[in-house]
Amino acid sequence: MTDTKQLFIEAGQSQLFHNWESLSRKDQEELLSNLEQISSKRSPAKLLEDCQNAIKFSLANSSKDTGVEISPLPPTSYESLIGNSKKENEYWRLGLEAIGKGEVAVILMAGGQGTRLGSSQPKGCYDIGLPSKKSLFQIQAEKLIRLQDMVKDKKVEIPWYIMTSGPTRAATEAYFQEHNYFGLNKEQITFFNQGTLPAFDLTGKHFLMKDPVNLSQSPDGNGGLYRAIKENKLNEDFDRRGIKHVYMYCVDNVLSKIADPVFIGFAIKHGFELATKAVRKRDAHESVGLIATKNEKPCVIEYSEISNELAEAKDKDGLLKLRAGNIVNHYYLVDLLKRDLDQWCENMPYHIAKKKIPAYDSVTGKYTKPTEPNGIKLEQFIFDVFDTVPLNKFGCLEVDRCKEFSPLKNGPGSKNDNPETSRLAYLKLGTSWLEDAGAIVKDGVLVEVSSKLSYAGENLSQFKGKVFDRSGIVLEK
């Protein structure tokens, strides 16, 4: 333990021990134990170096770089499903075949709390107000059940790896237990935690303290998924289960097509090692990350990084050249994860976020609740590994926004991306499936179609000719 203390002092963090003599023996041990947990993963000197590098990286990327060549993905890497039902059917068959062989697993990023939604629960527990009152977790679980039903002769259980965070882990597990895992086998679900990183002062040279025995810490961003996969030995679990393909998505999109056979089939057909879904930008100036190439390497660029001229540029078909909006929905070949995971964890850059961080001042012994940003939180971005994948092994599939993307970011009554927009998108999609199946739906009527009944509009022929003349109906299996 004394080695831990020395490690932090040598890294210039003697302020952490300013009140050492006034701490009780128990508090001294607790402080050292907490510091050792942090330093066992990354030395304090390395963390401080990472923060300094992130500050430099931020300064270097704070303006539009005219020396960088930004282009759309080439046709060999980019394909649209819009108006392309023949290809969609082909990919569906390929993906469903892989699911039937037990080769597909799903990773869900579900570490967020529903704070902005006015809820203290994990975001996945949130009820968007459907007639069925189903939560996001239940909707997603039932999509897996439906897929398993479609290959039931194979007796497949799709492994579901759910990444939580320190604040949401216990509540998430309890929620699944209370609901009997929504009909899934408990053994096919694995919970694991996202990592955390210490917070720094604005100079990036000192750690901030939460209280006399703890550093202030925060989640390490969606890019922390890779280190979490490594530290929780998921690759070894993929091997044990015979998994070859991994589908990754975020909890807050009610339209997510979990373990999407079409997307998986797209990657298999073209031999892609990493693939991502995109939705078409609504207009040239929609503030959304764009999937593109930077100096002929795949990447995601922020809207703020490109000039107005480039944002508005159109191709020969009159479409925006840069139109592939990022929805953080990925495919990974397990062989890629085995090969590159270590180097990703070692080499991925950190990004800084200046935040108002409640802190304890060990010199004065006082707590501060700042009204202005007083510190730096570090985070990693999941797409920062894209440029390590050869362009011919990287794919992007454009999907229909109305069918696949309705994020839940903001609370009830807000301008967009709220429970109302999510609920409407979900009900409209199910209702459109019924109409496609030959049902007669009166104007203004919306029907909820359970994910257990239909995954993507199939299995609804029994409603042909049936009249739906009121909203609030839930069609269950």
UniProtKB/Swiss-Prot annotation:
Substrate binds at N222, K409. InterPro entries: Nucleotide-diphossugar_trans (IPR029044), UDP-sugar_pyrophosphorylase (IPR039741), UDPGP_fam (IPR002618). GO terms for molecular function: UDP-N-acetylglucosamine diphosphorylase activity. Its main location: cytoplasm. One of its GO terms (cellular component) is nucleus. The keyword Ion transport does not apply. Pathway: Nucleotide-sugar biosynthesis; UDP-N-acetyl-alpha-D-glucosamine biosynthesis; UDP-N-acetyl-alpha-D-glucosamine from N-acetyl-alpha-D-glucosamine 1-phosphate: step 1/1. A motif (Substrate binding) lies at residues 109-112, 302-303. Belongs to the UDPGP type 1 family. This is UDP-N-acetylglucosamine pyrophosphorylase. The modification Phosphoserine is found at S218, S461. Keywords: Cytoplasm, Nucleotidyltransferase, Phosphoprotein, Transferase. It catalyses: N-acetyl-alpha-D-glucosamine 1-phosphate + UTP + H(+) = UDP-N-acetyl-alpha-D-glucosamine + diphosphate. GO terms for biological process: UDP-N-acetylglucosamine biosynthetic process. UTP binds at M109, A110, G111, G112, K123, Q194, G221, D252, K377. It comes from Saccharomyces cerevisiae (strain ATCC 204508 / S288c). Changing T115A: Decrease of activity. It is an enzyme of class 2 (transferase). Present with 5480 molecules/cell in log phase SD medium.
